[in-house]
Structure formats: C-alpha cells, structure tokens
Regions:
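A conserved acidic beta->alpha catalytic loop
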Residues: 49, 57-66, 85, 109
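Glycine-rich, basic loop-to-helix element that forms the pyrophosphate-binding segment
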Residues: 83-100, 110
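Conserved donor NDP-sugar-binding/catalytic core segment of glycosyltransferases
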Residues: 117-149
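Acidic helix N-cap motif at the loop->helix transition within catalytic regions
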Residues: 35-37, 62-70, 117
Length: 317
C-alpha cells in the first residue's frame, strides 16, 4: 500500500472533515528492548485507530532492531527509521517528526505506556478546543514491574516558568510543530522542557485532568540521578533563554523561575550570576521570592526524596 504524500494530505486537525485526523506517534529508542514491547503495545492498543507509529532506532546494539522489525511486519501503521550512528534523543525526535504525516503529533518513550484511551481523549480535546495548540494529561508513576507508585497530575502552564509542567503525555497540532521547528539538539535531557517553553510563548497550552499515561521509574531511566547535573544544567539554559519572554506566566511563577536560576548559580559557585537572577526575582514578585528562598533553605536541611527532580513535573533545582 503506497504511503500518503504528506504534502497532499488535508489538515483535519480542527475536525472539519468526516475523516478522522491522523495522529503521528514518534517513539525513539536506544537499546530499549527491555520495555519496548510494552511501549509499542500501548500504542497498538489505543481505542483511537487513526494513528501512525514511527519507531526511530538510534543505532541500538541489543534486540531492539528485531523487535522493531516484528512490529513493522504486524501492522502497516508502524514504520521505522534507523540511525547508523547514535545521535541521542533530541535528534531522534527530529528524525521522527520530519517523517510524520499526522494532523496531530506526539512522542513517547520506550519504557513508558499509554493508557488505552490516551490518544482518543487528547484528540477529542483538541477538536473541541480549536484555540488550544497543545493538550497535556495527568500521568502516574510506575516501577520497573509496572506497579503503581504515585500520581503526577498536570500542572498549570504558567508554572513552566520554573518547572516542566506538562509532564510526559501530550498531543499538539501540526501547526505547532511547523511554527516551532524541531527539538534543540544541544539540550539533551531538557529538549522537551525547552520545546514547551517555546510553545508557551506562541500557543495556548491546556491541561486535561485524566490519567492517560504511565511513566516508568527504573534504574535504566534517562532521567535517573546519574544524569541529574546534565538535566539541571540544560534545563537552566532553556529557562534563562525564555524566562524574560514568558509574559503569560504569573509574576510569582516568573519570580520563582529566577530564584531557581539563582540557586543553580550558587551551586556552581557563580555568585555574580546568582545575585543578578535573585535581584530579578525580587523585582518581579518580592513576597513570593523571599518565601520561596526560605522554604528552599529548610528543604536543604531535610532528606531529599530520591530522584524527585528527575520525574515528570520535577523542578529543576
């Protein structure tokens, strides 16, 4: 069956045609064979059927290529692309998005799972809310065996000024991708956060308070503490780049973002940059800035919940 030419497909993202909008799901993977089947099966098991799954193999050396080939044979909606050298997550995302034909786009990880109605619920939301560019949903945290650990509700988009408020379950219109372009390959492990900051400057982002996604917390997670410094560094780079322009965020949220930057500057010994960031926070919202710093000082004296910064909606400090 010949593939549809993406340049000739009509945009049905506003629900103006009887043909259901096509949803493109990009799934990048690198040596992810342990949980890859579960991730793919959660896509195949969606109640919404008008989707394509683009598997991007970032030069895996385990059983990942065999698993991908198996699913490409099983379902013609599944396609695959392989990098001949490892290019890391942001470039794998860009490779998948460049091949996507959908009216709506999303991506998922090789160790996480969609709930069965995830794509249907988010697609319906975008169809019913034409002014919204990105919808994002509640998640739950699961362990390496798939057991429930705790909830991760979607946060107000205004909080992007200091935290990745969107979490790991989202859907956006093709117009968002066409406006923003690809993910920043220089911000590995914070590429999604920077993308949402860009999106928030241009589009309406709306939470959908239904649990539609299972985020797995395990020893092989990219967001485990071994990558903590890289995540914090790149997230701060993204935040400093966009924070001055987040006029839609509440003043107290922008102030908190500047205090996060100040705290990270202190951690790396850059007291001049810390003072500048904190002064900006005080100018933006004096009261919340002072109370936030006091609370963070108290937290520093208490045991930290393991990995809390690295989870969906985790704060970058």
């Amino acid at each position: 069956v010949p593939e549809t030419d993406p340049t000739t497909r009509k945009d049905h993202s506003n629900g103006t045609s009887e043909q259901p909008p096509l949803v493109s799901i990009v799934l990048p993977t690198y040596n992810g064979s342990k949980y890859l089947r579960e991730a793919i099966e959660s896509c195949l098991g969606q109640t919404y059927q008008a989707w394509e799954l683009i598997l991007v193999d970032d030069c895996s050396s385990d059983e990942t290529p065999d698993i991908i080939a198996e699913y490409c044979r099983r379902d013609r909606r599944v396609r695959s692309i392989r990098h001949e050298v490892n290019k890391k997550l942001p470039q794998a995302l860009n490779t998948g998005h460049a091949a996507a034909r959908g009216d709506y786009l999303t991506w998922t990880s090789d160790d996480n799972r969609y709930r069965p109605a995830a794509i249907e619920e988010m697609t319906r939301f975008l169809q019913e809310h034409p002014a919204v560019g990105v919808v994002y949903a509640d998640c739950v945290l699961i362990d390496d065996t798939g057991r429930y650990m705790r909830d991760f509700p979607a946060l107000p988009a205004s909080r992007l000024a200091y935290v990745d408020a969107l979490g790991a379950c989202f859907l956006y219109r093709r117009s968002v991708y066409e406006t923003l372009g690809g993910y920043d390959v220089e911000l590995f492990l914070a590429e999604d956060y920077e993308y949402w900051l860009r999106a928030y400057r241009e589009f309406e982002l709306a939470p959908l308070h239904k649990v539609l996604y299972e985020y797995r917390w395990h020893t092989g997670s990219l967001t485990k503490s071994a990558n903590r410094r890289a995540i914090r560094t790149n997230a701060e780079r993204a935040l400093r780049r966009h924070l001055p322009y987040l006029r839609r965020s509440l003043p107290q949220d922008r102030a908190r973002g500047w205090t996060v930057c100040a705290a990270n500057a202190v951690r790396r010994g850059d007291l001049v940059q810390a003072a500048t960031a904190y002064a900006t926070a005080l100018r933006t919202a004096p009261g919340p800035s002072l109370s936030y710093v006091a609370r963070k000082l108290v937290e520093r004296l208490q045991p930290r919940r393991a990995g809390s910064e690295m989870l969906p909606n985790g704060e970058w400090s």
